[in-house]
């Protein structure tokens, strides 16, 4: 008995703390690919009998450009969103609280509920049904078409009004701070060409649609987004986050280290937009103009590759990168044609078929993890019932109903 008392009193070893991150690349209409992958992941969770909302498994969700649209669609409250709400009841979360020094008992405390937000399976519709609302094709002909092309050479290719109307329709006036898990969007500040990160946990009063507008302001396609920071009164001129981090994985890791400094591991699910590998053929480029036409894509591809390699080399970081070179030709970020959409959907299925086993392994660990301590829950805490002492619940002591 005395030996058993000493054994019980021994300090328990600290359990390994693992944080899970979802990152989504930029790429305009190629956002069809990560939206499709998330749809398949959600279907897989249901096949496993898990109906907990997908977003609630992650400790941080990050996006660049079109990836931000998907990230916010996953994590923001549905009340004002132009997205289909996921069906099903909210999920109750309880905490096991131990009481008593010698005769231990436990109480089950209702911590709140995990809300149903945007249905991951409806994210595809943002592109397949709304692409032409944002990238309005030029239907003019003859001389007027030539005049239109010449005018666009001197300015941005698209008017920002349709984009802003679409974002207002989807997000309304919902605040970025209302995201239910930490969510971030990468944009580029033209002052110094530095990154500007929109953070739900330090939102400076920004709206969801403002973050989405800034991070998707692709140069030559849309005019920069100009905002006044509501906390500092600083004037910000922001452009597409893809200029500095089309794959937001490094920015997400940096922010995760700040949010969760005591974590032992960071496991990242990184979703691509299926941009094809960049292959240069210098022997074919005779003039500087020919070189220049390939340099932008070469720089972007090289930047993404070295960023991914750098994060993968960090101790304590594991990356599940969902990308395969399946697109037969490059699809422009504003290509809303039926052929382009069909090609992207076909590529999405091929990528899923090739990478799903690795994703399943990631999901095995993800779904076994405890509820994150930064997940915002509905309703207030209250004691449900008292029970005999139980085993240590793990990080945060939070449980889902069986």
Question: What is the predicted role of each segment?
Answer:
Residues 2-402:
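Conserved catalytic cores and adjacent C-terminal regulatory segments
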């Amino acid at each position: 008995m005395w030996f058993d008392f000493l054994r019980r009193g021994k300090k328990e070893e600290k359990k390994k703390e693992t944080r899970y991150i979802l990152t989504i690349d930029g790429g305009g209409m190629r956002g069809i690919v990560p939206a499709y992958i998330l749809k398949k992941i959600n279907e897989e969770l249901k096949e496993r009998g898990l109906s907990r909302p997908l977003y609630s498994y992650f400790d941080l969700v990050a996006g660049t450009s079109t990836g931000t649209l998907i990230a916010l669609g996953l994590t923001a409250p549905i009340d004002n969103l132009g997205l289909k709400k996921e069906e099903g009841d909210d999920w109750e979360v309880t905490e096991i609280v131990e009481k008593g020094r010698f005769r231990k008992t436990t109480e089950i405390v209702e911590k709140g509920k995990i809300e149903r937000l945007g249905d991951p399976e409806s994210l595809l519709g943002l592109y397949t049904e709304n692409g032409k609302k944002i990238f309005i094709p030029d239907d003019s002909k003859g001389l007027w078409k030539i005049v239109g092309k010449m005018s666009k050479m001197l300015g941005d290719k698209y008017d920002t009004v349709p984009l802003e109307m679409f974002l207002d329709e989807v997000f309304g006036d919902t605040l970025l701070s209302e995201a239910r898990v930490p969510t971030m969007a990468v944009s580029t500040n033209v002052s110094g060409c530095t990154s500007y990160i929109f953070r739900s946990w330090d939102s400076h009063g920004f709206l969801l649609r403002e973050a989405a507008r800034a991070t998707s302001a692709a140069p030559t396609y849309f005019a920069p987004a100009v905002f006044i920071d509501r906390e500092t009164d600083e004037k910000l001129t922001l452009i597409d986050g893809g200029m500095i981090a089309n794959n937001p994985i490094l920015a997400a890791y940096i922010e995760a280290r700040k949010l969760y400094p005591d974590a032992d591991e960071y496991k990242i699910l990184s979703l691509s937009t299926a941009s094809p590998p960049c292959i240069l053929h210098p022997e074919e480029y005779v003039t500087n103009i020919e070189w220049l036409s390939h340099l932008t894509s070469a720089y972007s591809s090289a930047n993404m590759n070295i960023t991914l390699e750098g994060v993968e080399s960090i101790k304590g970081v594991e990356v599940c990168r969902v990308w395969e070179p399946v697109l037969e030709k490059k699809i422009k970020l504003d290509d809303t044609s039926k052929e382009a959409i069909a090609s992207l959907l076909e590529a999405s299925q091929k990528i899923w078929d090739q990478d799903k086993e690795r994703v399943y392994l990631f999901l095995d660990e993800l779904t076994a993890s405890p509820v994150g301590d930064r997940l915002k829950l509905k309703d207030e805490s209250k004691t449900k019932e008292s029970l005999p002492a139980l085993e240590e619940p793990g990080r945060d002591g939070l449980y889902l109903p069986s």
